[in-house]
Amino acid sequence: MLNCIYAISAGHEKTLEIAESILKEGGNAFDAAIAAHLAMYLTEPCMASAGAGGFALCHHVEHGTMMLDFFTQTPLSSRMDFDPDFRSILVNFGNESEEFHIGLASMATPGSVDGMFKLYERFASMPFEDIIAPVQDLARIGLAINKFQSIDIGLLEDIFASDPSVNDIFFNSGQILREGDHFILPHFSDFLDLLRYEGRDGFYLDYPARQIEKVCKENGGFLSRKDFESYTSRWVKVLEIPFKGFNVILPNLPCVGGLTMALLLKTYQEKGEDWLRAIYDFKACNYNFTQLAQAFSHTFPGQLKPTDSDSNFNRGTSHFNIMDKYGNAIALTCTLGEGSGYFIPGTDMQMNNMLGEAFLVPQGFHKWTPDTRLNSMMTPTMVKDKNRRLRFICGSGGAGRIPYMISQMIHSSVIRDMKLEDAMMDPRIYLYANAVQYETGYKGNIEIGLAHKEWKDLSLFFGGVHAIKINEDNSVEAEGDPRRFGAASIGYE
């Protein structure tokens, strides 16, 4: 028996509190996950929304471990018989600036709402109205902007400014919201009522879908009601990779992060357990999507799910983990991209800009394959021991760095058996911009003939690996990564 009745780690303290309230009411991990994900639309509006998508690893004590794919889908039609609303925007991340594209023609079909109802139908134990009750309470009162929210909203200020309908929400007297400012989505509670009374169809068949079709037809977007009507999230078999006496459970396609992490872990063992050499050699392969899938299938035959996608990147990600007293667990990662700058009227829900990220459409803008799942580096992860016991649950934000940071975290916490708090603070390493990037105190090899950049302060550059650890003696640890201002909680009888 576990020594606790629940454990949670998340990217925002209010997300955590919502999940905690459901578990205290007797709900299971999946009930809590639905509530937590919906709460993220308010607590982490730069990363989550009804207009977003994601992936979840779900471990059920009776039904095993499976992946829920509720990621975004390209529109059914790529016809260019209109002038697309598609404009570039430069986002300054501090150590780098990057160009993205927003507008109606950047929007892919979202999966978040459908995914939550798929999860509800399969594993929920509480009535839906009880699950969303604490989220509605939070929606009515709002919250104070925390430091990480302030950073994110500030980075994306120009995107929020592009839709006049939300100026009063994200700006205060013409200034973008800052830490400590009150934040509320005035229509969010009504939107939750729509889901409560009309379910999944309230979003995919009713007003939101009709409104998006109308604005796209009139102003230059690809999405139509048929895109929403045909969308479905799906359950997928997970990948299972042996690693130093444990089995690492990873998401299958379209999560290319799972393939990347599997091959990285194998390379790490082949390169004398040198993270820098493993990262360098793996990156030197410079796999495109097809080559990555072929390399994985050659190394781990018989596991890969067929897919017709060919992209491999995401920014703007967030993650949470929940484990309940029954032993059920979920690791869920979601993304909005940077956001399209279009908010569905009357909902305060921003649509994604997945078709505006160059890495997600390698063939070129407006040249994507219609009706196709986009791929992602999001990598919700679990680890089981040789007796098939769940021992570790984690995930991270951090775009293309996600599988590299999670791999190092698993090695520190699971293989080296460090206390989770110590493993969380264990310095990490990465290769970027032709330089070895490492945190102060990193004890491994840093020499590979490239320039060095030492990071003396914690930075979200090295991910945000929120995690839960189940020790051999059934004691449980939970930590939110301070690099992304994470939060964690463990409940006891």
Task: Identify the function of each model-found stretch.
Residues 1-24, 29-199, 203-205, 209-244, ...:
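Noncatalytic scaffold domains of N-terminal-nucleophile
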Residues 204-230, 288-309, 326, 339-343:
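Amphipathic alpha-helical
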Residues 250-254, 259, 383-401, 413:
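Extended C-terminal regions of large enzymes
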Residues 263-335, 346-347, 452, 458:
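Internal maturation/activation junctions in enzymes
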Residues 291, 295-298, 326, 372, ...:
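Extended C-terminal subregions enriched in glycine
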